[in-house]
A protein has these predicted regions:
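Acidic/histidine-rich catalytic neighborhood of metal-dependent amide-processing enzymes
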Residues: 179, 259-262, 285-376, 459
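Noncatalytic luminal/extracellular "stalk/propeptide" segments of secretory-pathway proteins
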Residues: 24, 30, 46, 50-164
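Active-site-adjacent substrate-binding region
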Residues: 185, 195-196, 213-216, 232, ...
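A conserved hydrophobic secondary-structure block that centers on an alpha-helix together
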Residues: 136-199
Length: 459
């Protein structure tokens, strides 16, 4: 009799598990179907990119994006939509930059350049000086002040093409952009030219943030990025004649901080409203292009998560919140302000997901989690396998959600295919035309599915 009862109980348990799995599978199927057939992310991104455009912190376009984001979230009939005050830096590019390689009296070759974010301007008449090519900071230090003083330093360390993970390649080269001016200035250089962070050879210079550290204003020097084709040309010419001169003209300027906002919307949890699940991207972008991949795609995908859940009449157990962060590109003020305010309110964030790697085909997610948490996450992998989401790895999640890191909150980042991302990253060709509608929608569906699973199972 006991064996019979045990057998029946076991069969009921297995049946219940199968039923639950089937139910979750069906829900994820609905999410993907809605995203691919009735999605709104692509149309949202069309407006954000083409009607608003580049959205550098402190600019009019950034404020237009805040107004647009709040209005669109209010249209979703969420439980709450509000703005969070953030003070952000204001840097203005001014007129477009000009540069040339001077090969002799009356002879020069123009090359594509752009100011690096945060750089100072050149004198109004421009800056002309001898140029020296180096690959790393060790080479710079070995030259010493006597060989660097009054010269342009040309940082020409290319992203390693042999690395499959292009973000790893980026991490091995980006310090020349972020720290190059400070280090060269300390040795008396008059300016720096940095090879663009781009694996492809083309004529688009790629901007990005740089910093002077604690350098006094009088020691600061102009910094610009040169396109990869321009870098190849300059390097080739220097190999033939190491007595070349370079000319740079730019009139960018830093201003005092100005007020801006994060945009936040949420659906209140029905069972555990104090457990918060956050999804987001950054609303600001660089000013050369439209910021379609970086990070317009992440913004509309994050908004789409809440829209899809509402569309399928899903009632979340936990509070699901979308945050459109301001100022990731040149200050991270939005992310740090959000985390600071959340801590002061003693909010319990159990999970945070960020999309800031472009709108390409999603491959999976990376997680910052404990062993126990990650084992639970891996048990969900079978739900997303049919949609070719097979990368579940431990690793860095995202800049904006990083300030929420506390040892308990699980942090995650969407990881699309990255091979084309740096073709567009921080460049003038990061436009809506570079977006594939289906890839964008697949990313939104993958994110929504993961948020659904976290809400269902928790930690």
């Amino acid at each position: 009799m006991k064996r019979t009862i045990f057998a029946v109980s076991f069969l009921l348990f297995v049946s219940l598990l199968h039923s639950q799995k089937t139910d979750h599978t069906k829900q994820i199927e609905i999410i993907y179907n809605l995203s691919l057939t009735k999605g709104k992310a692509y149309n949202w991104l069309d407006h954000l990119s083409n009607q608003i455009g580049g959205r550098l912190s402190g600019s009019l376009n950034a404020e237009r994006a805040v107004f647009w984001g709040k209005q669109e979230l209010e249209n979703l009939d969420l439980d709450r939509v509000y703005l969070e005050d953030v003070m952000v830096p204001k840097w203005v590019r001014g007129t477009f930059e000009y540069a040339s390689i001077i090969t002799g009296p009356g002879r020069s070759t123009n090359v594509p350049v752009c100011s690096l974010g945060g750089s100072i301007s050149t004198p109004a008449s421009g800056l002309r000086a001898q140029v020296i090519e180096i690959r790393n900071f060790e080479e710079l230090e070995s030259l010493g002040e006597e060989n660097v003083k009054d010269k342009f330093i040309f940082y020409n360390r290319a992203m390693p093409a042999g690395l499959i993970n292009t973000f790893e390649a980026y991490s091995k080269t980006v310090n020349q952009r972020s720290q190059g001016a400070e280090k060269a200035a300390r040795l008396g250089a008059v300016g720096v030219i940095v090879r663009s962070m781009n694996l492809r050879l083309d004529d688009y210079p790629h901007t990005g943030n740089m910093r002077y550290g604690n350098l006094p204003n009088k020691m600061r020097i102009p910094a610009a990025a040169i396109s990869t084709n321009g870098a190849q040309l300059l390097s080739s010419m220097l190999s033939l004649n190491n007595d070349l001169y370079f000319y740079l003209k730019q009139d960018c300027k830093n201003f005092p901080d100005v007020p801006s906002n994060n945009v936040i919307g949420e659906i209140k949890g029905s069972e555990f409203p104090n457990e918060i699940i956050v999804v987001g991207g950054h609303l600001d972008s660089w000013d050369l292009g439209d910021g379609a991949h970086d990070d317009g795609a992440g913004i509309v995908q994050s908004m789409e998560v809440l829209r899809l859940l509402k569309k399928m009449n899903y009632k979340p157990k936990r509070t699901i919140r979308v945050v459109l962060y301001m100022n990731e590109e040149n200050g991270l003020r939005g992310g740090t302000t959000y985390a600071k305010n959340a801590k002061s309110r003693k909010e319990n964030h159990i999970f945070a997901l960020e999309s800031d790697a472009g709108g390409f085909t999603p491959r999976g997610f990376v997680f910052e989690a404990t062993k126990k948490q990650f084992n639970k996450i891996k048990s969900w992998k079978s739900y997303l396998g049919p949609y070719m989401i097979d990368r579940f790895e431990l690793g860095g999640s995202g800049a904006d959600i990083g300030p929420l890191r506390n040892g308990n909150t699980v942090l995650s980042g969407l990881r699309p295919d990255s091979q084309r991302y740096f073709d567009y990253h921080h460049a003038a060709n990061d436009t809506f035309e570079a977006i594939n509608k289906r890839e964008l929608e697949l990313g939104a569906a993958a994110m929504t599915s993961l948020i659904y699973l976290v809400d269902q199972f928790g930690f």
